[in-house]
């Protein structure tokens, strides 16, 4: 019987685990970088999937020894055996790098949740990036979603969950057909707060580069303001899900541009 959970897959021999997890690498990514057969290439396709654990981290590199993977994914099981995406990142290795993930001394920032490299964050924001991005993305989220849904289906599931780390992530997931398990009212309240007369709009006082008034009408700049602490609390308690092959048609930010 084929395993249906991350914990089940992690009990398999390593070659089988690699083959199963490699299914959610989008073909378009492999073709873009002309990657070789990856399941046996341990330097380009790296995993952390200890036997007995219920999570897996995958890194796909376009060349051996490069600083950042072109694809990073961290998956885990929910309490009832569903697949939960904790983090999914696509990096363009040819784009400039911004060290928002580490301090000048090399210590990690955990994407700005532990500490912040403000100089790198400001440079990233000016270059059009959103919070958490060290490089521009690859614009492959649509085929990546399709490949991931094929992987989910192969495990016998018809839905999966995601944890948006930032405000803009949640909005992007909305646009790709996700619905909210929890946090929709929070997202709607944030949108309302940025409207004319709203409390959050009033806090966009130009006191620092992350709080410019123009952020009120931009998903990306709102996300930077939220990352900067404009909510007076972390952006948490938002969980989303998607049913394979369907779109929930949810929007908590009507009329707001990227």
For the regions a protein language model found, what residue spans apply to each?
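Long, acidic/serine-threonine-rich intrinsically disordered regions with weak helical/coil propensity
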Residues: 1-106
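Arginine residue identity/basic-tract feature
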Residues: 18, 23, 27, 48, ...
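Residue-identity detector for threonine
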Residues: 5, 39, 67, 76-78, ...
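Intrinsically disordered, low-complexity, charge-dense segments enriched in Lys/Arg
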Residues: 2, 7, 11, 188-258
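Acyl-donor binding region in acyl/amide transferases
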Residues: 81-177, 181, 186, 190-194
